């Protein structure tokens, strides 16, 4: 979204697993992950930080390198979203609230379509419904 806000002009965009808070509060979300990484090993079982740390242990080779990426994460002002008029698919798992509300994000974009698929933030990426939602939407653009 930051590239779109800075003037990138693709024919269309797909935002998967993203909600309104993740876009307009992106910098805050980045700070949350930095805090989680810096406190690794100390989070009580069952907390969001513990779950995120467990995922990170399985998928990230160098957590400290991720901190540098997260420090560059920026928020996008809500009013900027209203200027992004390209066709956009917002697709998200039915149980995914990780980055806020995907339907609210779709409503904030003037030319967006919302598609709900089964799953949560990480589980929905393994569902064939994600690929099918993107294929169907892209086919409808032609």
What positions do the PLM features span?
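Short, conserved loop/helix-junction motifs that constitute active-site signature segments
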Residues: 80-85, 107-109
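A short acidic, amphipathic alpha-helical/loop segment
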Residues: 2, 79-80, 101-104
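Proline-centered loop/turn at the N-terminus of a beta-strand
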Residues: 12, 87-89, 113
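Hydrophobic, aromatic-rich cap/lid helix
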Residues: 53-76
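Short beta-strand/loop motif that positions the catalytic acidic residue
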Residues: 83-84, 90-92
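Catalytic active-site module of serine/aspartate enzymes centered on a nucleophile-bearing elbow/loop
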Residues: 112-142
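Conserved loop-alpha-helix segment in the C-terminal half of the alpha/beta-hydrolase fold
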Residues: 94-120
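Flexible "cap/lid" loop of the alpha/beta hydrolase fold
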Residues: 1-40
């Amino acid at each position: 979204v930051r590239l779109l806000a800075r003037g990138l002009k693709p024919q269309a965009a797909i935002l998967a697993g993203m909600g309104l808070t993740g876009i307009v509060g992106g910098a805050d979300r980045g700070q949350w992950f930095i805090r989680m990484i810096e406190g690794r090993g100390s989070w009580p079982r069952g907390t969001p930080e513990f779950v995120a740390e467990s995922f990170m242990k399985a998928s990230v080779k160098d957590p400290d390198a991720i901190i540098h990426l997260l420090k560059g994460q920026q928020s996008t002002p809500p009013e900027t979203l209203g200027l992004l008029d390209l066709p956009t698919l917002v697709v998200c798992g039915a149980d995914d609230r990780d980055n806020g509300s995907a339907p609210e994000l779709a409503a904030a974009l003037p030319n967006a379509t919302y598609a709900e698929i089964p799953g949560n933030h990480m589980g929905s990426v393994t569902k064939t419904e994600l690929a099918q939602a993107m294929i169907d939407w892209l086919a409808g653009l032609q």
